[in-house]
């Protein structure tokens, strides 16, 4: 069933891929992005584009008035750099929390009652056990994770008070290309693309932060393909709305170490990847792996790419876009 959807932050990596999937499924899509990060080139053909900031309440009201009867909103607009959030926490509270507050107000005023929120595993902080289930304690260790958790609490309140039907999807480490289309995180901070930049000669080496974890070598993470992630968002936004806030972790349920990722990049690219050993970064957990049972049960989601083949199509994109996208429209 086709519909009309607003994608905030839809010129960024994940948001642009989700917008593309929505367009290809026959939906009318409006992308909203301020382009402080992200790239205009990432907005898929067939989607309308509004350049503006979700914190601007007048702008948001105009977007909703100009596009009557949005069937739902998929919300990606957020700052997401953990390190920056530690030194500039106010930036994250203002944008991630304040921006979502303005979005919820605009949705309420327009009678839009369906929301999918792009959340993060950072809301859980240091896990007590893995795989991580949705009922796990939420104790974020940085302002970025705290800001996302605050948004989750806001959404829960909105659902109870005003009948919002919402799904939050905390996901873990996303990578890969989507049928040849991949944007870059801006600025890049994720392991797989950083290692691929070493293979391209754009970086001299990859820093490995600690090899003294209680793992076979280095810390272990759950990697999810961006196309699988996009499919989960589409399934979530199609759920029947109601005064409920559902949280569904998205991941493959298995983990790979930093060393395994580096070795895979060496094999796929044929390039040596020099490593620089560095101390652990603060409170980096040894293992972060998701339990996606709720997403499977409630959304009918089944990821189709559960191994490091994710590296191959990411390398294909990086090889054809050696400098990434360099326009901001």
UniProtKB/Swiss-Prot annotation:
Chain segments annotated as coiled-coil in the UniProt record: none
Cofactor(s) listed: NAD(+)
Pathway linked to the protein: Carbohydrate metabolism; galactose metabolism
Binding site for NAD(+): 13-14, 33-38, 53-54, 76-80, 95, 120, 144, 148, 172
Residues holding substrate: 120, 144, 173, 190-191, 207-209, 221, 281-284
Class of this enzyme: isomerase
Transmembrane segments: none
Catalytic activity, as annotated: UDP-alpha-D-glucose = UDP-alpha-D-galactose
E.C. no: 5.1.3.2
Keywords: Carbohydrate metabolism, Galactose metabolism, Isomerase, NAD
Presence of the UniProt keyword NAD in the record: yes
GO biological process, one term: galactose catabolic process via UDP-galactose, Leloir pathway
Active-site feature positions: 144 (proton acceptor)
Pfam families per UniProt: Epimerase
SUPFAM superfamilies: NAD(P)-binding Rossmann-fold domains
CDD domains noted in UniProt: UDP_G4E_1_SDR_e (cd05247)
GO function terms (MF aspect): UDP-glucose 4-epimerase activity
Biological function: Involved in the metabolism of galactose. Catalyzes the conversion of UDP-galactose (UDP-Gal) to UDP-glucose (UDP-Glc) through a mechanism involving the transient reduction of NAD.
Entry-linked PANTHER family: UDP-ARABINOSE 4-EPIMERASE 1, UDP-GLUCOSE 4-EPIMERASE
Family of the protein in this entry: Belongs to the NAD(P)-dependent epimerase/dehydratase family.
Quaternary structure, from the entry: Homodimer.
Protein name, entry field: UDP-glucose 4-epimerase
Organism: Streptomyces lividans
